[in-house]
């Protein structure tokens, strides 16, 4: 936010702060040979798949040293060597691209899978139906991963669809749908995504995954967030921070000590 206000970042920026568990838990199942596409809020997946942070920040600043040579900005990040085939500023724009990439993997018999990351709002775009239908018909190796953060810009998802859970749409296409109610628990997301990955890697066709999470900030840097109460946002920030929850998990399971985690935090 500070860099945006100072004019360092060029163009619109859409933060994924608060959705760290959803991003990391999903991407940990992907190798560099797998492929993923994402949306305007794709920084989280890009970081989780080891995008060079200096090059990412250079891209946000519009510099030629950026991952997209300074021409893509915040919404168009790509790192082909690590399977990141691009984030997309068009709502629902990644679906058809992912289906095409999945068709290539199937045709070449690579054994790799493709993931299309999106928010809840994009699932009401026509391209979602068209892409899932084609992927299901041809049994393509693609996962449609939905991060349901409850709001499509300012539209509450409960006012935008009569379907209480988006993953249930999978039934209409004859494919499995997987649901993670607690998308701020990175281990829960990892387990849910693992089931979908096993299904798709097994040559059984596509799957839909829905995880429920929450973005701390507005839809973009231009969004004042007046459609949400301060109490609602503070509840998520103070009591459901995915990073703090994972930190507590590591300590409670004796995987890492408080001192070790403090040292990592200071390095960051």
Residue map of PLM features:
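Glycine/aspartate-rich loop-and-adjacent alpha/beta segment that forms the canonical ThDP
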Residues: 199-267
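Short gly/pro/ser/thr-enriched loop/turn and capping motifs at secondary-structure boundaries
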Residues: 44, 150-153, 215-217
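Cofactor-binding active-site loop characterized by glycine-rich and histidine/acidic residues
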Residues: 8-138, 156-162, 167-174
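Conserved thiamine diphosphate
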Residues: 106-112, 162-195, 239-266
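Residue-level marker for buried hydrophobic side chains located in beta-strands
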Residues: 117, 144-145
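Short, proline-centered helix/strand-breaking motifs
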Residues: 141-143, 176
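Glycine-rich, charged/polar anion/phosphate-binding loops
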Residues: 128-131, 191-198
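Cofactor-/ligand-binding subdomain signature composed of acidic, glycine-rich
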Residues: 1-10, 32, 245, 252
């Amino acid at each position: 936010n500070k860099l945006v206000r100072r004019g360092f970042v060029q163009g619109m920026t859409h933060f994924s702060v608060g959705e760290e568990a959803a991003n990391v838990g999903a991407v940990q199942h992907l190798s560099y040979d797998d492929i993923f596409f994402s949306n305007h809020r794709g920084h989280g997946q890009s970081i989780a798949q080891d995008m060079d942070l200096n090059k990412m920040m250079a891209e946000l600043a519009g510099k030629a040293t950026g991952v997209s040579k300074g021409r893509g900005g915040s919404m168009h990040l790509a790192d082909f060597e690590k399977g990141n085939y691009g984030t997309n500023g068009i709502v629902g724009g990644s679906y058809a691209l992912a289906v095409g990439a999945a068709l290539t993997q199937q045709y070449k018999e690579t054994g790799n899978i493709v993931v299309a990351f999106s928010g809840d709002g994009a699932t009401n775009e026509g391209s979602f139906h068209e892409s899932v239908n084609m992927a299901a018909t041809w049994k393509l190796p693609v996962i449609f991963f939905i991060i349901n953060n409850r709001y499509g810009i300012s539209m509450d998802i409960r006012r935008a669809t009569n379907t209480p859970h988006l993953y249930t749409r999978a039934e209409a296409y004859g494919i499995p749908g997987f649901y993670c109610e607690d998308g701020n628990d990175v281990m829960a997301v990892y387990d849910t995504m693992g089931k979908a990955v096993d299904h798709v890697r097994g040559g059984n066709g596509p799957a839909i995954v829905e995880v429920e999470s929450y973005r701390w900030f507005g839809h973009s840097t231009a969004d004042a967030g007046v459609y949400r109460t301060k109490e609602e946002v503070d509840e998520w920030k103070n009591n459901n921070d995915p990073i703090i929850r994972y930190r507590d998990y590591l300590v409670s399971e004796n995987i890492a000590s408080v001192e070790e985690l403090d040292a990592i935090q200071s390095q960051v």
